[in-house]
Amino acid sequence: MKLRESNIQKLDRGVYDVLIIGGGINGAVAAAALSGKGASVALIDQRDFAGFTSQQSSNLAWGGIKYLESHDYALVRKLCLSRNHLIDSYPSRVQEIRFLSTIEKGFRFHPWFLWAGTWVYWLFGNGFTKIPRLLFKRAINREEPAINTQNAAGGFEYSDAYLHDNDSRFVFQFVRSAMDRGGIAANYVESLGARRDGDLWITQARDVIDGKTLDIRSKVLINAAGPFVDEHNQRTGEQTEHHHLFSKGIHLIVDRKSIV
């Protein structure tokens, strides 16, 4: 709490090279990268860091295997290389994980075709992970006896990556890195909007806890507010060609007993 109060007191002193609004993964990474390059950076978030979209992930860093079916190969290639970069850059935080999937009899694709797809996926990732495996029913029963293979034609196993701790911790480590490099970060500080004053951005902010307002001066303003990007642009009077279109996904976890 004392660190937060100290950082808030520094926010309206002097001029920052960059003010970043939003402490999710994009804002946190931007703060760490810019601070590492020697820029003076301030980062604020109206809630907890990684307190919204960035803490509602599946904790996976994947290469987009499902997009092979829609033939979006360029995207799969890009995602696989990004996944590899994360594993290589943060080996204690992002680690390889194996996935095993069974294939029901009568499925629209033959098991050999799906297995070939996992090899394409592996090759798009430059063979960075362990090789895929084609599994027959007998092998699945031997290696994973908890899986019900009564109606299975076989299965396959391939690799992706996951966040070893969790998504929020992963994000905060970038916030911490930014502060270690001289950046100023404060949560529960809401941007009320910004205006131009010559070559500077003047952002009016409010301490959500005590209600006090302050002005933050910066040469550059980065709006990394996630789902609140459009709302903040309206507050600031910024017009953009593109706007957010929200979507929601579901990751369903079932009781282990229901698969036996």
Give short role names for the model-derived ranges.
Residues N187-W201:
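A conserved short coil-to-beta-strand element within the FAD-binding core of flavoproteins
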Residues N59-E143:
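Dinucleotide-binding Rossmann-like beta1-alpha1 core, especially the glycine-rich loop
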Residues G14-Y16, D210-V220:
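Core beta-strand elements of the Rossmann-like FAD/NAD(P) dinucleotide-binding domain
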Residues N223-E238:
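Flavin (primarily FAD) binding-site architecture
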Residues M1-V18, A33-K37:
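Extreme N-terminal leader/targeting segments of oxidoreductases
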Residues S35-Q56:
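Glycine-rich FAD pyrophosphate-binding loop
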Residues I21, I216-G226:
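Short hydrophobic core segments
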Residues R142-R181, A185, I202-Q204, K212-I216:
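Helix-loop-beta segment of a Rossmann-like dinucleotide-binding subdomain
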